[in-house]
């Protein structure tokens, strides 16, 4: 198989940035799928009672990312109150189970008490009517719980938000057996793929040969780039946004709502879940671990290169070599995961409010 070698460049600010799973369009697509699937259901009425006039699952889907800064616009009093009450809210979006593993379980290496599985459990419990501290230690309100479920069901279907890469200095992917082994000396945390770098020009050139060209943007929707374009792209960023764009282009859709309409019309075959809905996050995490093995298939990291953050702190990054057809299987997997996320979001809300 042809290989694409991705060179390393200075990209510290990008490699060290916060992860926003699926990006704006991906999260909106998950919400839009659920909006359409829930029309006319008892759950739709319960959802409407918690949303503000004009809000939909699609429109609130990015709220938990927007509270991390002002890139969505000025923060509302509701956002500021949520951040003040949840100082570790950025940790709610992911878990870091070695991607080679098959299952998530409480206390596993890479898991945490505030990770995505535990946070989803709490939010689902709230909508089930449980408000005791054992079920809801963060004291989420029902509205916050709905917003978090809408967003985090999307996040947990992004493979790199569950399956994490741990790397030796020479670039080998390794499986730490304990948290203590991730010491930054023999075993490094690749930070959800943020410290694994693709050459942006090369991956773009490769995708141009196998992914349909983007449809012309609607008039007035183009925005200038917020930052100078980096010569490298973190693997996490590729999975957050780039593959979503590829997946939408392969379906000839331009907006999240068009994507939702197209995939629902195709009558996608989506695996269901069983048991109490509070156990479903474990099932989703296991499925995402399986997906992360596909995301890392054929991906090879080179030796570590030390860089320095804006705070003057040293850290390591690794240049990647990926299979030459990587945009094709990765965008196919992204399409599947977005569809599964939308259908599972609708299903869990129906299960809570039958």
Model-derived regions, located:
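Residue-level detector of transmembrane insertion/anchoring sites
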Residues: 7-8, 147
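N-terminal signal peptide c-region/cleavage motif recognized by signal peptidases
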Residues: 16-18
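N-terminal, motif-rich segments that launch catalysis or mediate targeting to/interaction with membranes
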Residues: 20-152, 159-354
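Bacterial N-terminal signal peptides that target proteins for export
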Residues: 1-7
């Amino acid at each position: 198989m042809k290989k694409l070698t991705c060179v390393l460049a200075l990209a510290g600010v990008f490699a060290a940035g916060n992860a926003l799973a699926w990006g704006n369009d991906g999260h909106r697509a998950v919400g839009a799928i659920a909006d359409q699937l829930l029309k006319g259901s008892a759950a739709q009425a319960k959802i409407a009672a918690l949303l503000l006039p004009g809000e939909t699952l699609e429109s609130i889907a990015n709220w938990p990312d927007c509270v991390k800064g002002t890139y969505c616009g000025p923060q509302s009093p509701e956002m500021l109150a949520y951040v003040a009450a949840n100082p570790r809210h950025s940790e709610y979006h992911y878990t870091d189970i070695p991607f080679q593993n098959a299952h998530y379980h409480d206390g596993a290496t890479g898991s945490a008490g505030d990770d995505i599985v535990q946070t989803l459990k709490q939010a689902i419990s709230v909508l089930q009517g449980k408000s005791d501290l054992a079920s809801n230690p963060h004291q989420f309100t029902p509205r916050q719980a709905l917003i978090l479920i809408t967003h985090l069901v999307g996040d947990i279907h992004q493979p790199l938000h569950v399956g994490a890469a741990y790397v030796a200095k020479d670039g080998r992917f390794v499986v730490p057996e304990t948290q203590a082994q991730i010491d930054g000396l023999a075993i490094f945390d690749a930070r959800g793929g943020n410290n694994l770098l693709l050459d942006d020009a090369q991956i773009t050139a490769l995708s141009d040969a196998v992914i349909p060209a983007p449809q012309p943007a609607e008039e007035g929707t183009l925005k200038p780039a917020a930052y100078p374009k980096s010569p490298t792209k973190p693997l996490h960023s590729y999975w957050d946004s780039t593959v979503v764009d590829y997946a939408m282009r392969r379906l000839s859709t331009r907006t999240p709502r068009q994507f939702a309409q197209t995939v629902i019309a195709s009558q996608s075959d989506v695996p269901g879940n069983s048991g109490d809905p509070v156990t479903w996050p474990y099932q989703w995490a296991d499925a995402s671990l399986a997906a992360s093995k596909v995301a890392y298939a054929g991906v090879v990291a080179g030796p570590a290169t030390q860089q320095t953050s804006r705070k003057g702190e040293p850290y390591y990054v690794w240049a990647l070599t990926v299979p030459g057809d990587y945009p094709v299987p990765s965008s196919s997997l992204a399409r599947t995961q977005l569809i599964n996320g939308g259908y599972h979001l609708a299903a869990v809300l129906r299960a809570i409010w039958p």
